[in-house]
Regions:
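Short non-catalytic regulatory patches outside canonical folded cores
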Residues: 229-232
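Charged, non-catalytic interaction/linker regions at domain boundaries
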Residues: 1-219, 223, 227
Length: 232
């Protein structure tokens, strides 16, 4: 029987409204689709409950889910990351526009909110594993203490934060792109561009912000548009 499998946690994203297609979803940690998995893997629930902000306030991470019966083409890290990227770019330009019009910063304006947490639950080991370019590690859930990013304010993500027509169009293209092993160049280019745009949408720096930091992000935006205009 097919089930929903948690792939990554997103502790910077306080999800109040799920984003779902047949193969994948981003949901709040209280979503009923997690119940069957948590019954089989109670250690995962423990992991989910061990997140706070830097001052100890409890945080409920967003969860990216994958359907166990999804075609293999949807199970690659590229497909998962592209799903995250399309959501981020359906939110950030829209929220930056709202922030400009209404003269406020209380909006999700940076893609750091959509970052995947590097430690994940491993069903075989019943432990946490981390596999990044910098480290490959395994550790106990018992001693884990997860935190949100200290450079981000606590903001809730809801359906009103999304440019819905853009999101629906990108979800349709995502299913076309990853529904085949031989995608069209235009579909490959779109999601390469979105990935570059997601990088360009990160905070340019923390407390060490300079004009160099801003210039770096501008360069990434230029690359995102160049990818789209390339003919292949």
């Amino acid at each position: 029987m097919a089930e929903w499998i948690p792939v990554f946690l997103m502790p910077n994203l306080r999800v109040a409204h799920d984003i779902t297609v047949d193969e994948m979803a981003i949901v709040p940690s209280t979503d009923e689709r997690l119940q069957a998995y948590e019954t089989k893997h109670p250690q995962f629930r423990q992991f989910l409950q061990k997140f706070t902000d830097p001052f100890g306030a409890r945080v409920s991470p967003g969860v990216l889910l994958l359907r166990s019966d999804a075609p293999e083409t949807f199970k690659s890290i590229e497909a998962v990351s592209s799903f995250r990227d399309l959501l981020a770019l359906s939110v950030i330009p829209f929220q930056r526009a709202k922030g400009t019009v209404h003269d406020g910063s209380h909006h999700i304006q940076y893609s750091d909110y959509f970052d995947f947490y590097p430690w994940v639950y491993h069903e075989g080991h019943k432990h946490l594993v981390c596999n990044t370019p910098a480290q490959v590690s395994l550790h106990e859930i018992r001693v884990f203490r997860g935190q949100t990013s200290p450079i981000l304010s606590a903001l809730e993500f809801d359906h009103i934060d999304v440019d819905s027509p853009l999101l629906n169009a990108l979800l349709q293209r995502w299913r076309i792109r990853y529904g085949t092993k031989r995608p069209q160049w235009s579909d490959r280019a779109l999601f390469r561009s979105l990935n570059m745009a997601a990088a360009a949408s990160k905070m340019p720096a923390g407390v060490d912000l300079t004009t160099f930091s801003l210039g770096r992000n501008i360069g990434l935006w230029v690359s995102a548009f160049e990818i789209l205009t390339h003919t292949g």
